[in-house]
Amino acid sequence: MSKVSGSNGGDSKNTLYCSFCGKSQHEVRKLIAGPTVFICDECVELCMDIIREENKSSMVKSRDGVPTPQDIIKVLDEYVIGQRQAKKILSVAVHNHYKRLAHASKNGEVELAKSNIMLVGPTGCGKTYLAQTLARIIDVPFTMADATTLTEAGYVGEDVENIILKLLQAADYNVERAQRGIVYIDEVDKISRKSDNPSITRDVSGEGVQQALLKIMEGTVASVPPQGGRKHPQQEFLQVDTTNILFICGGAFAGLDKIISARGEKTSIGFGATVKAQDDRRVGEVLRELEPEDLVKFGLIPEFIGRLPVLATLEDLDEDALIQILSEPKNALIKQYQRLFEMEDVELTFHEDALREIARKAIVRKTGARGLRSIMEKILLDTMFELPTLEGVREVVISEEVVRGSARPLYIYADRQEEKANASA
């Protein structure tokens, strides 16, 4: 309960006082009542300032505030299946980035350059999820931008400075906190140069966006409207320094594996030419040989690649990895649907061969882990529709035939479970 200060007069016996500073209810704007004590709005603000300062100093001064690469990878393992090499590269890069910030605040002797990260891997292999999990581990503001919506300033579409605005919003407009955040730019392969030949038509959503991103990725002071919206001359702007913001770019780069394979082949003709067998390796295996020059051939400008010195490639997920994704992580899909069914007091059970069939379907769709949820929704749609109106159902069993569509899920009722219990006794 809060008491709003009234007039200065009144009975002194009924006057309430702040238990911390001793001011009366007439001297402050608000007085908040607890069971036996009172606190005024001024003391609340003072406490908040002290807490902010403590958090800031511990974040900057304590080396323990930066998780070790082993700590980071341990948490990533709980949420993301496989991709060991990519996780190792990311954990070291993120650890070094925040260690660099702590070092910079202690002395200005050696200036350590920022190491932005490029994630390359097939669709649905966990690029976005890795970046989101990293931000959660470090506990810094995080925002995600879609490169396909970005255009050069002055054209229809989003300016690159809108990315910084989103980060500022994620930090509740705390500029200092936003300046230590992480930005993930997805679908960065879609802003590749449209062609090698210069054209009379300006490429405002391809090379133009790459050029616009250069400055904010390297470090500049961006002017951001305080509460969003369009810029106008009379408006005051918030100044956000992007020097210490970590940028992670990700993309599927469809066809990049062919560029890498072509680089490795020797071009020879005639009777003495070496006949090379078809490259049957999976996309992820080919991507391991990625070099910056391959990204230039794909259509990214050298200056843009230069701002992303850390290259991490992710592998396409095989059947076993998809089964693990379904059942093992903390927030695995199977666990999510089992929790949904628990709300109806029903146990949801999947046979091992059912999980394998779901994984096979996802591989056929070529959507990676992203396609698993839509497959699960299709399998369980009728069951989730009927279940709230059915009485006595205690368990739903999903078999391989159910996943294939040749059978309906098995419903086990309460009386059948009692029969099972009696039989086992």
UniProtKB/Swiss-Prot annotation:
PROSITE patterns: CLPX_ZB (PS51902). Residues 6-59 form the ClpX-type ZB domain. Zn(2+) binds at C18, C21, C40, C43. Coiled coil: none annotated. It comes from the Bacteria. InterPro entries: AAA+_ATPase, ATP-dep_Clp_protease_ClpX, ATPase_AAA_core, Clp_ATPase_C, Clp_protease_ATP-bd_su_ClpX, ClpX_bact, P-loop_NTPase, Znf_CppX_C4. ATP binds at P122, T123, G124, C125, G126, K127, T128, Y129. Keywords: ATP-binding, Chaperone, Metal-binding, Nucleotide-binding, Zinc. SUPFAM superfamilies: Glucocorticoid receptor-like (DNA-binding domain) (SSF57716), P-loop containing nucleoside triphosphate hydrolases (SSF52540). ATP-dependent specificity component of the Clp protease. It directs the protease to specific substrates. Can perform chaperone functions in the absence of ClpP. Component of the ClpX-ClpP complex. Forms a hexameric ring that, in the presence of ATP, binds to fourteen ClpP subunits assembled into a disk-like structure with a central cavity, resembling the structure of eukaryotic proteasomes. This is ATP-dependent Clp protease ATP-binding subunit ClpX. It comes from Rhizobium etli (strain ATCC 51251 / DSM 11541 / JCM 21823 / NBRC 15573 / CFN 42). The lineage of its organism: Bacteria, Pseudomonadati, Pseudomonadota, Alphaproteobacteria, Hyphomicrobiales. The gene is clpX.
